[in-house]
Amino acid sequence: MELKGKRVLVVGLGESGLAMAKWLHRQGALVRVADSRDNPPNIDALQRVAPGAELVAGAFAEATFAGADFVALSPGVPKATPEIAALEIPLISEIELFADGVREQVPNSQIIAITGSNGKTTTTALTAHLLNGAGVPAIACGNISPSALDALMDAQDAGALPQVWVVELSSFQLETTHHLNAAAATVLNVSEDHLDRYEGSLANYAAAKSRVFQGKGVMVLNRDDDWSMANGRCGRKMVTFGLNAAPRGVDYGYADGAIWRGKDKLVAIDALKLSGLHNAANAMAALALCEAIGVDPLRLIEPLKGFSGLPHRVETVAEIGGVLYVDDSKGTNVGATLAAIEGMGRKVAIVLGGDGKGQDFSPLKPALEKHGRAVALIGRDAAAIGMALEGSGVPTRILGDMEAAVLWLAAQAQAGDCVLLSPACASLDMYRNYAHRAQAFIDAVEGLKS
């Protein structure tokens, strides 16, 4: 893609928008940045990284887009925004710029692309960890942060370009990505999330995810997820993983408490620091992705054993009186919370609630009928979740804040149980972000010790 002299409008001045402006400036493009906020973030940083870039802040107008050759759209700005939808010029993403930059400037490196409703950040971090542990230089970037273009520019500046880019991708990033051409890619799973952006359609959301398979690379598919498996295509190499026996010698599976490749046992899951069957699935996906680019899975087992996971993703906080307290604040949708409930292997007393993003909470009911000890509901959609759980037989109470929720659940829990924060909701109705929510949970658990 020839960028020199092109007039490019970057829409949105968050992390991704700033990275696009910086990259485009470096490539000799004429950069204008538009943000619908009157006082967007990163104004000073924009002038440092893209001197001379024009900034248009405030409500979009026809003049905002005048003269642009194409628009580089930040993932937080929907394509359906009326002023964007009316455009007749190309829309591209940061990831499109990144993939093009890698092809043109780092042609000897490969891209591994990872998306899914749940587990994509852990799988991205784990895949990069496995590759580096096996002596294959890799950088994790994208939705996981740093942004893909920031990672590329930083590696160029440091003269330390990796062999592999492991890129976490959201559906938002994929909407305007057209030529990703990853060497290997996966859709880990698809469950209800962000449906407010996709007209309430799970099929539209899944279609955005499936764009990760652009090109001819190896497809890594989840046998336990119909949406993932639906991406299978004739003429493409496909490897599957799932929480059952591997059907073919090239596939990954779970049986007898261990991860297998075909009929070869690789590692017992109790030898891993990662906990939960959902993380066994993430590990299988990571192994398959690494093998897809030519790394022998036997070289990956020791690094796999050493990976302890990421903060706020099924992370043990404490054990008090025989009860485990686990922070899964990153469980922001129903699918993630189901995975946590079913993967704990014990009864759960759970904190649910927040901004439900229009999800259907009814799938939680059978899981809690089987695994639930008690349910504490907080936040904006507490009542809606409570209605979805009616008749479950599990004690349920709406409470005013995290401290009250943890205190009540601690009183309901029995030795051997888990008090689990996995809210199935976004956090912004009560907290700055999911990490702030996690800290409230951790503080409440600490209060139990005193």
Curated annotation (Swiss-Prot):
This is UDP-N-acetylmuramoylalanine--D-glutamate ligase. It comes from the Bacteria. GO terms for molecular function: ATP binding; UDP-N-acetylmuramoylalanine-D-glutamate ligase activity. The keyword Transport does not apply. It holds the Pfam family Mur_ligase_M. InterPro entries: Mur-like_cat_sf, Mur_ligase_C, Mur_ligase_C_dom_sf, Mur_ligase_cen, MurD. GO terms for biological process: cell division; cell wall organization; peptidoglycan biosynthetic process; regulation of cell shape. Its main location: cytoplasm. The keyword Repeat does not apply. ATP binds at residues 116-122. It is an enzyme of class 6 (ligase). Keywords: ATP-binding, Cell cycle, Cell division, Cell shape, Cell wall biogenesis/degradation, Cytoplasm, Ligase, Nucleotide-binding, Peptidoglycan synthesis. It is found in: Cytoplasm. Its EC number is 6.3.2.9. Pathway: Cell wall biogenesis; peptidoglycan biosynthesis.
